[in-house]
């Protein structure tokens, strides 16, 4: 049982003190969802092994009354298993599979393109002692030896291409307050973590001012006394479109179902064209 209702969390921070890791972000939300206070152990990309006493080279890591738990997904499952009397993060194995699908979809749709658009900002905002490591590791492991500067260059042409790909996500949130239904759950926290990561490094906004995602994002950032409102975060909204850029989202003119079509409420839903009388010979 968590001593004094507090669980220790090893963070991954930028120079501003803002959390950068989406995995740490969703663990922060998971702990708050369960009603725990969080004892943050600060730190950046380097020195994780030393901070965790040789237990891990990656974060998040939590310590619950002496019990060490690694990996954000494992941590969430651990919290539900150990504290079933508190609000649940998951509701059964089927929901877990759907969450994993959404998580993978967001990473391929948004995180991948945005990573390349903000990779130099990512480096510049890191702790000074981390920057050599960030440059070397990202250039060698993720960018095939390309320089950060070369990869980020031209992002003004690429940023407008991402918002239209998020339309399926907008359609879901147009039908429900939270991904978890009436209340948020780990699906919301995992998805919010993508945008929290983006806000930590995005010196140029990735979304337009009028993006319908704003409502869900604002409510999500405000959860748990403004957990997502760190002064080191950058604005997500304010992307300026140029002539020829694609429309950032579909502007709904009426109620829509999950597939973007009008809800079927009976024969009156389908408006058939008037029948034209055939001319007599």
Swiss-Prot record:
It is found in: Cell inner membrane. GO terms for molecular function: hydrolase activity. It holds the Pfam family GST_C_7. Residues 244-281 are annotated as: Disordered. One of its GO terms (cellular component) is plasma membrane. PROSITE patterns: GST_NTER. It is a peripheral membrane protein. Residues 11-87 form the GST N-terminal domain. Gene3D superfamilies: 1.20.1050.10, Glutaredoxin. Its main location: membrane. GO terms for biological process: lignin catabolic process. Keywords: Cell inner membrane, Cell membrane, Hydrolase, Lignin degradation, Membrane. Able to degrade various dimeric lignin compounds. Catalyzes the unique and reductive cleavage of arylglycerol-beta-aryl ether. Belongs to the GST superfamily. This is Beta-etherase. It comes from Sphingobium sp. (strain NBRC 103272 / SYK-6).
């Amino acid at each position: 049982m968590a001593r004094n209702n507090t669980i220790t969390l090893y963070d991954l921070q930028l120079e501003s003190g803002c959390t950068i890791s989406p995995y740490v972000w969703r663990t922060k939300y998971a702990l708050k969802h369960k009603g725990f206070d969080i004892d943050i152990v600060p730190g950046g990309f380097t020195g994780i092994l030393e901070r965790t006493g040789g237990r891990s080279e990656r974060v998040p890591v939590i310590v619950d009354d002496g019990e060490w738990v690694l990996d954000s997904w494992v941590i969430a499952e651990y919290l539900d298993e150990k504290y079933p009397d508190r609000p649940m993060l998951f509701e059964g194995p089927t929901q877990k599979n759907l969450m994993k699908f959404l998580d993978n979809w967001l990473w391929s749709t948004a995180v991948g393109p945005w990573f390349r658009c903000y990779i130099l900002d990512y480096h510049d905002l890191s702790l000074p002692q981390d920057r050599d490591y960030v440059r070397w590791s990202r250039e060698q492991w993720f960018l095939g030896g390309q320089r950060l500067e070369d990869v980020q260059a031209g992002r003004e042409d690429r940023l407008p291409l991402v918002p239209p790909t998020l339309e399926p996500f907008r359609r879901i949130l147009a039908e429900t307050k939270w991904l978890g239904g009436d209340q948020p759950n780990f699906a919301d926290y995992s998805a919010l973590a993508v945008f929290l990561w983006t806000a930590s490094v995005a010196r140029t906004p990735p979304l337009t001012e009028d993006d319908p995602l704003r409502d869900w994002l604002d409510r999500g950032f405000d959860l748990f006394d403004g957990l997502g409102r760190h002064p080191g975060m950058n604005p997500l909204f304010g992307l300026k479109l140029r002539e020829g850029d694609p429309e950032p989202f579909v502007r709904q003119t009426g109620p829509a179902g999950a597939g973007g079509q009008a809800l079927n409420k009976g024969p009156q839903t389908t408006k058939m064209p008037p029948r034209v009388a055939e001319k007599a010979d």
